[in-house]
């Protein structure tokens, strides 16, 4: 068997104020040298992109739940057409209209483009969410310099939530039959 190691200077393991001050100074000096190696400039480099010119239609696709929306965006007066009908006729709910127009309003481009959409599948909320994603993707394709603004607002993120499938032996996706102890 091995004998326990004897520490002759047990009392020297206790740090005094001078040791703590020296360690703090060394730590600060070390972190300052690390900080110098990493460029942490607070000024963000912004590149002014040339004014984007829309030479042809921009085609994009947006999906949400079961809805799929195909959008064709062209330069125009701000008319939005959904399956041959106006936006107000197709989406009478003002909340859905605001949801769809949100990327255009954020970038201040409400009356700049004509948007023609082919909507299919899902319900009104899913179609509105898919429409918003398709418009945001079209605006991103038109001017990639505005991508950070759209990304920060969450307009370029595809909402992956969908209905969970029903499982065998359960009433619904997670609803189990009532438990009976006896």
Swiss-Prot record:
Signal peptide: none annotated. The keyword Ribonucleoprotein applies. The keyword Ribosomal protein applies. GO terms for biological process: translation. Pfam families: Ribosomal_S9 (PF00380). One of its GO terms (cellular component) is cytoplasm. One of its GO terms (molecular function) is structural constituent of ribosome. Keywords: Ribonucleoprotein, Ribosomal protein. PANTHER family: RIBOSOMAL PROTEIN S9, SMALL RIBOSOMAL SUBUNIT PROTEIN US9M. Belongs to the universal ribosomal protein uS9 family. This is Small ribosomal subunit protein uS9. The gene is rpsI.
């Amino acid at each position: 068997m091995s004998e326990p190691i004897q520490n002759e200077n047990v009392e020297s393991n206790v740090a005094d104020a001078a040791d703590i001050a020296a360690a703090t100074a060394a730590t600060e000096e070390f972190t300052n040298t690390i900080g110098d190696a990493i460029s942490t400039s607070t000024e963000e480099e912004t590149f002014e992109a040339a004014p984007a010119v829309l030479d042809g239609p921009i085609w994009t696709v947006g999906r949400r739940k079961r809805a799929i929306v195909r959008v064709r965006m062209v330069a125009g007066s701000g008319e939005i057409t959904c399956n041959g009908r106006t936006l107000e006729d197709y989406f009478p709910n003002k909340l859905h209209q605001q949801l769809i127009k949100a990327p255009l309003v954020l970038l201040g481009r409400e009356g700049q483009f004509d948007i023609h959409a082919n909507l299919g599948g899902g319900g009104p909320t899913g179609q509105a969410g898919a429409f918003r994603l398709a418009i945001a993707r079209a605006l991103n394709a038109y001017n990639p310099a505005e991508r950070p603004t759209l990304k920060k607002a969450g307009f370029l993120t595809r909402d992956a939530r969908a209905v969970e499938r029903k499982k065998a032996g359960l009433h619904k996706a997670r609803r189990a039959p009532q438990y009976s102890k006896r």
